[in-house]
């Protein structure tokens, strides 16, 4: 139920005719050159989400893009061409180089981190987004409430760790 609720915006778009039921043909599903992920020189990825004009302009400035076609941000007919050009641009540097270029920027461009990198990222460390319990790194509970402290009560079980307990409870022969 909760997952379908997360789709409310998209069903609203679809119902009003501004969302096509085809993958990568819409503003927020990878069709737009300014809202997608791009591979970098090192095979890692960067996320781009520059919808608003000021963020889009900052992206172009930081990327040193002066091509006049990019001024037509919402012209869907040229999105594939602009996406290709951005793809080439992002392939010119490693992900972490791009992350440094956009670090203190409002351009809405961020590195895509893997499961090992995410807990070590300075933003996540400063927000205490992750914790380690019994040698297992995991996200801290969210949202956080000022008067209701949240805690992780146990670590994830290892595969098969509770097979005997479950099989006895449900009278299953292993």
Go through the PLM ranges and name each one:
Residues 129-174:
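Flexible, small-/acidic-enriched active-site or ligand-binding loops
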Residues 34-105, 109:
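Aromatic-enriched alpha-helical interface/lid elements that frame and gate functional surfaces
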Residues 53, 117, 150:
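Short, glycine-/Ser/Thr-/acidic-enriched flexible segments
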Residues 14-24, 121-133:
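Short, surface-exposed loop/helix-turn segments at secondary-structure junctions
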Residues 2-4, 78, 117-121:
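Beta-rich nucleic-acid/ligand-interaction surfaces
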Residues 103-125:
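Conserved PLP cofactor-binding pocket of PLP-dependent enzymes
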Residues 1-50:
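Active-site-adjacent "lid/gating" segments in soluble enzymes
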